[in-house]
Design a protein with these regions (language model features):
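A cross-kingdom signal targeting lumenal/periplasmic-facing segments of multi-pass membrane
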Residues: 1-40, 48, 55
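Primarily the internal scaffold of c-type cytochrome electron-transfer domains
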Residues: 1-3, 9-14, 35-37, 62-182
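Short, flexible loop/turn elements at secondary-structure junctions
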Residues: 25-27, 57, 98, 139
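Membrane-entry segments of alpha-helical transmembrane domains in multi-pass membrane proteins
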Residues: 39-49, 87-90
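C-terminal substrate/ligand-recognition segments
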Residues: 48-50, 54-64
Length: 182
């Protein structure tokens, strides 16, 4: 089971939108500090947490786009995410890395004596690229253009089917606080 190893950041809800708090708890120093990307001197409580964040920092959240006309630049519609906070599955569960588990759970519920895991993807059955892509779906940074939701990714899928290559960006203007960990 995945747990917070480095830091823990909280959020708050305002209607159907969530916002990141500017302080985080850092386990290495056993203390609170400024959350990544926030100013240490100017408090900001307006950093919107959208589906992209939940796709790697939770197991699931139901969401939809609400396109509403309004007073916007060039009269364009504004797409606003509507998150269902009651559907949020906190933490990273088994299915995020091993795929859908309903058949696995049903089989082992009916056969409690069976000790061999079945009806679920074991990492050793994936080739090297599939294993790398499975981790990279969340640990390769946020500099690529997403084609489809990370929630749809299943073991054995190719990362190239989820993201387009990144355009060269000015790293000082669009800093990725995730550090491209992969």
């Amino acid at each position: 089971m995945h747990r917070q190893r480095h830091a823990q950041t909280s959020l708050y809800w305002q209607d159907d939108r969530s916002f990141e708090l500017p302080v985080s708890y850092y386990h290495a120093v056993n203390n609170w500090g400024t959350s990544p990307g926030f100013s240490a001197t100017v408090p900001n409580f307006n950093r919107l947490i959208g589906t992209d964040c939940f796709e790697c920092h939770s197991s699931y959240i139901s969401h939809k786009k609400n396109t509403a006309a309004g007073d916007h630049y060039f009269a364009a519609d504004a797409a606003v995410e509507i998150l269902d906070k009651n559907s949020l599955v906190l933490g990273i569960g088994c299915q995020r890395c091993h795929g859908p588990a309903a058949a696995h759970v049903n089989f082992h519920t009916e056969n409690p004596g069976k000790q061999t895991a079945g009806h679920i993807t074991a990492n050793k059955t994936l080739n090297r690229q599939q294993q790398l892509d499975q981790c990279a779906v969340c640990h390769s940074g946020n500099d690529k253009r997403k084609i489809q939701s990370r929630f749809m990714f299943r073991p054995g899928d190719l990362l190239a089917n989820y993201f387009l290559p990144a355009a060269v960006a000015d790293s000082t203007r669009h800093f990725d606080v995730h550090g491209n960990q992969f």
